[in-house]
């Protein structure tokens, strides 16, 4: 009886807090210029992941994207069949992508392997420029950097809001999951490249699976030049982003920004509402910004 009363009391406290949180999030959305999402969608491999495989998850992923309606999405890991599926089913978005193994290993990975892909709302933005580079000492060539296990690539776009004329740069990346030196060098290289491409005064955003936690000194170059949405936004959470299909809980997926004000940040963990246990082995995250 005491446990039941305690549960009811805690529930009574939680519901008003949730209502306040939802109200604050709605207020932030009303003020925001853009909504950015980062989503490691988990690579497609026929027969892999059992009930959590891509075919079992893809309709739920579409439903989530349509429900959240982000302006720009940075994807990590999609293979060509996943990209084609998203393009066909989300025609309101244009996309820019690059495979980390493109132009090499053609016989083994004819589709370019894992990609980085940015989708942006056609009706809202004009694409001014775009590009890509490998995260290595030879960024213009297909290459693997330092002690990385895999080739890693970054994709970027420069977008202009059709209505307001405001411009910004958006970079989408994926750091190596094995090489510690590679992750450290990747953070330094990302800052150098963003400065070179976007300059110091432009609004710049970076999203991605960085395969390390925020408190790790490897990310210091990024933290010195940009702000994490989770830390900067007044409406935020502290939920994990890597779920490993229920096996682990880590925060390794990020949205960073420079010269933009974060209004809200969210980790989407309620995949059950879309009819699946997990949308991916990573939880999508999004942030609302004022330019």
Task: Give residue spans per PLM region.
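N-terminal, active-site-proximal structural segment of metallo-dependent hydrolase catalytic domains
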Residues: 17-90, 100-113, 188, 291
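Surface-exposed cleft-lining segments at the edges of enzyme active sites
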Residues: 45-50, 135-146, 173-181
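Active-site-proximal beta-strand/loop segments in catalytic clefts of secreted hydrolases
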Residues: 37-42, 75-79, 98-101, 121-122, ...
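Structured beta-strand-rich core segments of catalytic domains in phosphoester-bond hydrolases
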Residues: 25-28, 76-167, 267-269
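Metal-dependent phosphoester-hydrolase catalytic domains
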Residues: 21-26, 124, 181, 185, ...
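Active-site beta-strand/loop signature of hydrolases that rely on acidic residues for catalysis
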Residues: 34-41, 61-86, 119, 157, ...
């Amino acid at each position: 009886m005491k446990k039941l009363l305690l549960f009811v009391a805690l529930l009574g406290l939680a519901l008003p807090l949730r209502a306040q949180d939802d109200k604050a999030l709605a207020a932030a959305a009303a003020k925001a210029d853009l909504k950015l999402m980062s989503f490691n969608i988990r690579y497609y491999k026929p027969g892999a992941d059992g009930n959590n495989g891509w075919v079992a998850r893809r309709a739920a992923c579409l439903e989530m994207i349509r429900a959240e309606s982000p302006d720009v999405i940075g994807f990590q890991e999609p293979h060509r069949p996943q990209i084609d599926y998203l393009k066909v089913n989300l025609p309101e978005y244009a996309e820019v992508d690059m495979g980390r193994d493109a132009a090499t290993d053609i016989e083994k990975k004819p589709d370019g392997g894992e990609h980085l892909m940015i989708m942006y709302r056609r009706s809202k933005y004009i694409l001014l420029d775009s590009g890509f580079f490998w995260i290595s000492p030879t960024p213009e060539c297909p290459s693997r950097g330092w002690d990385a296990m895999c080739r890693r690539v970054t994709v970027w776009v420069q977008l202009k809001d059709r209505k307001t004329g405001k411009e910004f740069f958006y970079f989408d990346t994926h750091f190596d999951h094995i090489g510690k030196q590679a992750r450290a060098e990747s953070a330094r290289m990302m800052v150098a490249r963003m400065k070179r491409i976007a300059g110091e005064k432009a609004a710049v955003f970076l999203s991605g699976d960085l395969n390390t936690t925020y408190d790790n000194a490897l990310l210091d170059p990024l933290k010195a030049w940009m702000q994490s949405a989770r830390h900067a936004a007044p409406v935020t959470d502290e939920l994990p982003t890597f779920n490993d299909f229920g096996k682990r809980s880590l925060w390794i997926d990020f949205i960073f920004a420079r010269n933009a004000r974060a209004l809200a940040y969210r980790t989407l963990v309620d995949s059950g509402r879309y009819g699946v246990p997990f949308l991916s082995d990573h939880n999508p995250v999004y942030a609302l910004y004022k330019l």
